[in-house]
A protein has these predicted regions:
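Hydrophobic anchor residue at the start of the ABC signature
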Residues: 153
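Conserved ABC ATPase "signature" region
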Residues: 110, 117-135, 187
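Conserved signature/switch motifs of ABC ATPase nucleotide-binding domains
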Residues: 138-141, 159
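The feature captures the beta-strand-to-loop junction immediately N-terminal to the Walker
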Residues: 47-49
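Conserved ABC transporter NBD signature motif
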Residues: 70-82
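Short coil-to-helix segment of the ABC ATPase nucleotide-binding domain corresponding to the Q-loop/switch region
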Residues: 99-107
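Helix-to-loop junction immediately C-terminal to a conserved catalytic motif
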Residues: 62
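Catalytic Walker B motif of ABC-type/P-loop ATPase nucleotide-binding domains
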Residues: 164-167
Length: 276
C-alpha cells in the first residue's frame, strides 16, 4: 500500500477508537477517531499531554491491544495480534534480570529457531553495535541506566524489525546520557531505515530526532496536527537545538501543543477538587 506521494505505508490507523472498561464497569475512551500514517523509513515522533493515549496508540500498532473501532494496518495488513515485524522499546526495561547481556540479546533469535551458537554470535555483533563490548557477561543490575537502554535496543533490533515503537525510552536518563543515546539511536536508525514511532513528552527531543511530529489532543486522543521537521541529516541532537529553524519549529509546535496541555491540566485540577 502506498500513500499519495508514492511511498510505501508502513503504518496506518484509520478511524481508530479505543475504550477501556474499569473493574466497576465504567467505560473510558482513550482514543477517538484517530487517523495516522507513517511511511516506510520515516522517523515519526508523537507528542501530547499526559493521558492523551500516546502509549495506547503504540499498543494498538504492536497488536498488544485490539481497537474498539477502526482499523490498524501494518504494511497493508490488518493487525490481529502481535507481529514479529514490529519491535517495541518500553519506557521501563523489559530485560530479564537473571540473564546476562549475551543471553538477553540472544533471546529473540533463539525464539525464532536460530541455533544457540549462531544466536550468541549474532548477539555479540549487536552488543558491539550498541557500544556494550566488554560487558557481555554482566547482568542487568550491574549496568548503568544508559547501558541498560543499550541492552534493550540490542535486544529489540537484533530481530531486525521493520517497525520500531519506542515509548519514552530515554526519559529516566540524565541529560548527558540521554543526548548520547539519542545520537546512537539516530545512527542505528540511519543504518536500518526501520519505520520509527517515538512517543515522548519532550518536544525538543521530538524535533531533534524526527522527520515529522504528530500532536495528539487531550484525551480522548486524536491527531490535532502534524509538522514536517525540515532539519538536515545527519543530526547531532545537542547541537541542532541552537539552529534558528529548530527554535522556529519549537515555537510553532509548542503554540499548538500548549493548548492541549492546559486542557489536560484543568481537567486534572477538577478531578482533584471532586476527589480531594
Amino acid at each position: 500500500m502506498t500513500n499519495r506521494g508514492g511511498r510505501v505505508l508502513a503504518i496506518e490507523l484509520d478511524g481508530v477508537t479505543k475504550r477501556f472498561v474499569s473493574p466497576s464497569g465504567a467505560s473510558f475512551t482513550a482514543l477517538r477517531d484517530l487517523d495516522m500514517k507513517v511511511v516506510e523509513g520515516e522517523f515519526c515522533a508523537v507528542v501530547g499531554p499526559s493521558g492523551c493515549g500516546k502509549s495506547t496508540t503504540l499498543a494498538l500498532i504492536s497488536g498488544l491491544e485490539p481497537t474498539s473501532l477502526g482499523t490498524v494496518r501494518v504494511y497493508g495488513e490488518p493487525v490481529r495480534g502481535v507481529t514479529p515485524r514490529v519491535g517495541y522499546v518500553f519506557q521501563r526495561d523489559a530485560v530479564f534480570p537473571w540473564k546476562n547481556v549475551v543471553d538477553n540479546v540472544a533471546i529473540g533469535p533463539r525464539f525464532h529457531g536460530v541455533a544457540g551458537h549462531d544466536a550468541n554470535d549474532l548477539a555479540r555483533t549487536w552488543i558491539q553495535r550498541v557500544g556494550l563490548s566488554g560487558f557481555e557477561h554482566y547482568y542487568p543490575h550491574q549496568l548503568s541506566g544508559g547501558m541498560r537502554k543499550r541492552l534493550a535496543l540490542a535486544q529489540t533490533l537484533i530481530n531486525e524489525p521493520r517497525i520500531l515503537l519506542m515509548d519514552e525510552p530515554f526519559s529516566a536518563l540524565d541529560v548527558q546520557t540521554r543526548a548520547l543515546m539519542e545520537n546512537e539511536l539516530l545512527e542505528i536508525w540511519a543504518a536500518s531505515r526501520a519505520s520509527v514511532v517515538f512517543v515522548t513528552h519532550d518536544l525538543e527531543e521530538a524535533i531533534a530526532l524526527a522527520d515529522r511530529v504528530v500532536v495528539i489532543t487531550a484525551g480522548p486522543g486524536t491527531v490535532k496536527s502534524t509538522y514536517a521537521v525540515d532539519l538536515p541529516r545527519p543530526r547531532n541532537v545537542a547541537e541542532i537545538r541552537f539552529q534558528p529553524r529548530f527554535v522556529q519549529l519549537y515555537e510553532e509546535i509548542w503554540n499548538d501543543l500548549k493548548d492541549e496541555v492546559l486542557v489536560s491540566y484543568e481537567r486534572s485540577k477538577q478531578r482533584v477538587a471532586v476527589n480531594p
